[in-house]
Structures are given as structure tokens and as C-alpha cells.
Amino acid sequence: MGLFSSTQPPQPTTVPSDEIIPLHFWNTALCMRGTVLDVSLKFDDVLDVSKLRDALNRLLEMEDWRQLGARLRMNVDGKLEYHIPAHFDASRPAFSMTNAQHETSIADHPLGARIPHTTGTPAIFPSPDELSPLLRSADAPKHIDDWTYSDRPQLCIHVITFSDATVITITWLHTLADVMGMTTILNAWTALLQGNREAIPKLQGFRSDPLTQLGQRTPAEKYMHFNRVFGRKEFLWFIGLNIFDRLWYRQEERRTICIPATCLRSLRQQASSEISATSSSEGGTVPFVSESDVLLGWWVRSLYGALGLRTDQTILVNNALNLRTSLHESFMSKDSAYMGNALCMSPTFLQGQQIADEPLGQIALRIRESVAEQRTPEQVEAMTALQMQTMEKTGYLALVGDPRMMLLSCSNWHKARLFDMDFSPAVLQSSAQSSSQNTQKKGKPSYVNGVQHSENSFRNVLSVIGKDAGRNWWLTGVLRTDAWAHVEEQVHKLGSS
């Protein structure tokens, strides 16, 4: 190699028969390009790998579903595009599926034994990243280059089988889909396993772009927080302060939290009582808050202490708003499903003094009401227009608020219902027992592991993974290492209250 030679191999040669489709603008944001997702579903059953492969093969041969077998390329203009093979075969399969077989029980495997499980009490587990050597194949992709400089299909699946359990790990680049988009794939996959082809919707795939149309209906200036959008100066100031924080607190950890059903029930009752007391004094009806609202309120209050936030500080709680469930007409078709990323961030502004003084119920209600305000058709359209304008200029999603604020983000995967995925037709033998002590159902995941691979930090990001068959809630958060001690205290308090 010469001094100025690139060590990057050339992209594979374009196959003339491939159909080439540019990626939707919305899917090309830098944060999408830079994030690879792993979702692992752990079953207390032995699944038939050949049935899994056959059903997915049949799905990706169906009409628009074939698009999911596309290859990702970067064209000469630096734009991402999909190359969809005219047909799939052994040399160019629609997806990658590998299988690691272990003859022992999962409990006897060094890493398998460390997969989190419910204990009946609130618990914090080590980083889900530590399970990656078991849950992903040795050559599983971690970077966009692993797709663009190979002929790798979009979906990479690794199945790990034990004598009494199975884990399915799906790996994909965020440009393909968000978690709700992956749920669309999983639902269609399981429908074919069950022989229910009629339940599979048409795919609003790579050729359809409702988000761009959505962003052209209402001016960005109509967005309720438009006057707080970061300009270049505010953005650089915010980034600089966050870089300083990461230099000062260099170590960070991703941890998994399990909150038992009984604890969350008590927490929600507490929140409802607090809201009721305020509403009664004001003579109004008692507003509703969901379990997810209460969980996020509890998390925000916990981080107020864990991060040492000030009473005069602005705290921005950024909720990922799923546009598919925003009830907007662009996504209301019962016969088709949108594939891709369909997210906007819905900010709730809080002051440190509010978090210090107000009860849990009031914080949860503030978050819920703020999100509801931003779910109207006009606000969804204005938010989308703002994000498109910002991405065109910078490649990044828009930020609003104060450069000195503390940003806490939340992505609610519970809406994807990952614990409800029914793979029972592929069960060969089951160790899942339904009883008064064990509510686990055959062919449904008992645990879901979520990991993001990125050069960017996910510090102060919470993922609400979902609620298992026993109604226990699972969360994954990334915090600077020293903050976890305070969060552990708050988790243990839930068990003693």
C-alpha cells in the first residue's frame, strides 16, 4: 500500500439485475447510520431452527417483503441506497442465519447462566453487553461498513440452542428500521410459523415515503417549541458541555433493571393517590397515568439525585414519539405496515426545583400531558417538518431547549410487545411451566436483551424494554458509572416499601 492508499476494500460490484432504491431521507440521519441494534429473545423452550429459517425464507419471498433482502451501498455522491437482488439463492440469501448448538442446559453455560431472570424482588443486573459473546455470532456486524463493504443482507440472525432453551438474536442497522419496524417483521415471521398468511400486511417499504409527505403539510414554525430550537451556537455550546461531562466522568455503564409487578403496582397506586389529592383540591376529575408514565417519572426522580442535578437547572425529558401510533392518517392503514424509522422526540421541560419538590404522581402526569400536547396532527406535522429541515442542513436531528440543560432520553420498547412474540409452532420441547408461581407461556420470550453498538455515547438514555408474562418490567439504562450507586439505592427502596 502506498502512503496515501486507503485500507478500506472497495464495495462489491453492482449486480446489473439488482433493483436500486435510494434510502428515505428520514433513515439517513447520522444517528441512524451510526447505530447497530441487537435484540435477543430468550425462550425457555427448544425451538426448531429449520422451521424458523423456512418461515423467514417464505416471508422474504413475498411481494414487497423481498425488499428486506436488500444490500446496502454508498453511491458516488455519498448517498445510501438499497440494491435488491432479482432473486435469492445460497450465494445471495435474503437474510443471514447462523446457529450455535450447546448440548448442555443454559444454566450450565458460563454466560447463559448470567442471563437475567426474575427473583421476585427489584434487581439491577450487569451490562447486557457482557452477554454479547454468547448472543451474537463471531462475525456479526457492528458498523455500517460491515454492510456497505460486503454483500451482507440487512437481517443478521443468530440462534443459540441449549438442551432446555433457545435465544434468537436479530442484528440490524438502524437505517433499516426502529424497534417498532422490527416488530412488524417479527409479527409477520410468527404469523407464517402459525400458518396465518392472511395476517401478514402489505409492506410500505422502501418505495413509499409517507414521512416526507408528512413534513410538507404544516410549517415547522407551528411547532410549539420552535422558539427554543438550537441554532449553530447553542448546538456547539451544548455539545461542548457534554464533551466536558464525558471527559470529567469518563466511565459509563449500561445496566439492566427488573421491577416486579407488585412493586410497580404499589408505585402506580402511590402516583394515582398523589394526583387524586391534587385533583380533588382543585375540584377536577382525576387524570390517568400509565405504568410507563410512572416508570419514567420514577427514573427522572432517581437521576435527579444520582446525577447531582441543581434546583435551578433545566431538565429535558426527551420521549421517543412513535409516529405509527400517533393516530396520524399517514400511518392508519390496516392493510399495510410502514417499514423504516418513524420517530420524533417529544420534549418535556422540567425544572430541578419541580423534581425536588413535587411528588412522583405530579412528575409522571407532567410528562404524560406534555407528550399528549405534541401528538396532535398539527404538532406531529410541524415536528416532522422541523426535523427534515434540520437534517438537510446538519445531518442531525433537531434539539430544543437550553444548552446548559440536562438531557434525559427515553425510548419505550414496551409498545413493540416483544415479550408477546409467539414462536410456539417452532417449539420442539418446552421447559416453560404455567403455574401460580410461573406464568411463562410456551413459545414466548421470558427475557429480552437489547444492545446498541455505536461510537456515540448513549449516556442518560433509558430503554423501557417491556413487561414479561409475570407483568414484571424490564429496563436498560446507560449512566456514568458513579451514578449507578444511587439508582441501586432507589431500586432497593422499591422492594422495602
UniProtKB/Swiss-Prot annotation:
Pfam families (alphabetical): Transferase (PF02458)
Region named Disordered: 430-451
Catalytic activity, EC: 2.3.1.-
Catalytic residues (UniProt): 174 (proton acceptor), 422 (proton acceptor)
Presence of the UniProt keyword Acyltransferase in the record: yes
GO MF annotation terms: acyltransferase activity
GO biological-process terms attached to the record: terpenoid biosynthetic process
Pathway assigned in UniProt: Secondary metabolite biosynthesis; terpenoid biosynthesis
Entry keywords, A to Z: Acyltransferase, Transferase
Function text: Acetyltransferase; part of the gene cluster that mediates the biosynthesis of andrastins, meroterpenoid compounds that exhibit inhibitory activity against ras farnesyltransferase, suggesting that they could be promising leads for antitumor agents. The first step of the pathway is the synthesis of 3,5-dimethylorsellinic acid (DMOA) by the polyketide synthase adrD via condensation of one acetyl-CoA starter unit with 3 malonyl-CoA units and 2 methylations. DMAO is then converted to farnesyl-DMAO by the prenyltransferase adrG.
Family (UniProt): Belongs to the plant acyltransferase family.
Subunit structure: Monomer.
Protein name, per record: Acetyltransferase adrJ
Source species of the chain: Penicillium rubens (strain ATCC 28089 / DSM 1075 / NRRL 1951 / Wisconsin 54-1255)
